[in-house]
Amino acid sequence: MGRCRLTRQPPEGERIAHLETFRTTITPVLTVRQAAQAVAFYQRAFGAEEIYRNTYPDGRIVAELTIDGARFRVADEAPEAANLSPEALNGTTVRINLLVADPDQLCERAIANGAVEIAPIADQSYGLRQGRLADPFGPHWLVGRPLTGRSGDWARTPDR
């Protein structure tokens, strides 16, 4: 892929400040074909905001997005680096669990923008109101919210 070009450089001193406040995180990277179009879909369907975008000389991108503070990345497929899209794999190996205040509304918007419903939103026995979508680029999303008045892991807000 070669060297990438940042479209936004961090302000002077930001990297040092970041190291002083470093915290372990997990950031999923969704490898897809047509990452720029996937970014536009996530913005329309999920209300995602783009934080940054790296553009490589061959036109492929890696972009970081956030949905209400939950970060994830979207990258163009790079077979030479063993980064394959769900289309190349003929399936997906990861499901993204997205908890939001109104999963019904978000799923309706996602479907209107091209997502496919795999399982409808419903109250689940494990304490979530949840459904499953496949986005137009292959990744699967479990969209839900904790059910109110329920005990168990999903009913509590994690302190992390």
Residue ranges, per PLM feature:
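Vicinal oxygen chelate
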Residues: 5-29, 40-134, 143-160
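Short, surface-exposed ligand-recognition loops at beta-strand->loop->(often short) alpha-helix junctions
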Residues: 31-34
